[in-house]
Amino acid sequence: LHMTMHSLTKSAIFFAVGHIAQVKGTQKIAEIRGLTQSHPALGWGLVIGVVAIAGLPPLGIFMSEFLIVSSTFAREPLLAVPLVFGLLVAFGALTLRMTDIAFGKPTGNLGPVEASYVPLYAHLALVFIAGFYLPGPLVSWFQNVARLLG
């Protein structure tokens, strides 16, 4: 479950970053600011993707990370502490970087770019839906895979 949610979210972020590089004409994080103002669909898509990859509710990665953390606490409590610490550090780093990129003063653009946001938002929609509902057959499939892997 976690690998599926992570893959969907990460690919959505990659779609967003590719569009950002086209629109801004750079891949340098320090030169990209204010995306939610200058390119709202792109900026908010990136924000949602980063929030999802950080494992915040109600998105699907939260559910999978919660299951991982709670299982770790139940089986190996000493391993759960560094796991939670690592998740908190990752969240802090993502938040620190994302603040200026999304909400800072907008920087220059190369101009309009013809790009589809369908893949970005389709992947994010699946991750969002998975935070609330997983169909029974999909849950059974994930459980069978988990049993096979031990």
Residue ranges and their predicted role:
Residues 2-7:
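Short alpha-helical catalytic segment bearing the HExxH-like zincin motif
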Residues 8-13, 146-150:
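Alpha-helical transmembrane segments and their membrane-interface exit regions
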Residues 9-82, 108-127:
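Interfacial and helix-entry/exit segments of alpha-helical transmembrane bundles
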Residues 39-42, 91, 95-150:
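Cytoplasmic/organellar membrane-interface segments at the starts of transmembrane helices
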Residues 77-97:
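Alpha-helical transmembrane segments of multi-pass integral membrane proteins
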